[in-house]
């Protein structure tokens, strides 16, 4: 007969995988979103130069908008790490699921935010108008990532 202490397993590896997924999926989405927005910003500046128009520097903001989701993934990863204090199976599975799913949602939000930022850069280059409205729409997509982060933190704290 084995001692009950011998049967106790350490499930911290599940928590670590959840931490990595939260950060990596968020960062991948941010990277793809930033590339999409950056390419459109560069194309927008090119249109301005060709047409002899002023090049709006604010398009740098469009290009960088998806990068904030990497920060959210990092924050989520840090909050998941709190479960390392008690690496039970239930905390391991919860951390893994939250890391994968919330990380993916945050990353997808960044990807689509990059697409909207790309359209915004193109529209601003064409018209020179609507900057505030473009940032409002970009911010709406940002809200999905923020809600995901906050709701994930609430679940982790239960």
Predicted regions and their residues:
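Short, Lys/Arg-enriched N-terminal segments with co-localized hydrophobic residues
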Residues: 1-8
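Hydrophobic, small-residue-rich transmembrane alpha-helices and their short perimembrane loops
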Residues: 8-158
């Amino acid at each position: 007969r084995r001692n009950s202490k011998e049967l106790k397993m350490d499930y911290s590896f599940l928590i670590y995988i959840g931490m990595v997924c939260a950060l990596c999926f968020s960062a991948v989405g941010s990277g793809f979103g930033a590339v999409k927005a950056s390419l459109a910003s560069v194309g927008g500046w090119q249109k301005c130069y060709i047409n002899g128009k002023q090049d709006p520097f604010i398009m740098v903001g469009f290009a960088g908008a998806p990068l904030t989701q990497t920060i959210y993934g990092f924050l989520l990863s840090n909050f998941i790490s709190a479960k390392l204090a008690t690496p039970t199976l239930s905390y391991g599975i919860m951390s893994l699921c939250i890391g994968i799913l919330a990380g993916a949602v945050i990353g997808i939000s960044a990807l689509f935010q990059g697409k909207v930022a790309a359209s915004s850069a193109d529209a601003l280059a064409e018209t020179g108008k609507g900057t505030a409205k473009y940032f409002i729409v970009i911010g709406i997509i940002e809200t999905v990532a923020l809600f995901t982060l906050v709701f994930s933190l609430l679940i982790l704290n239960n």
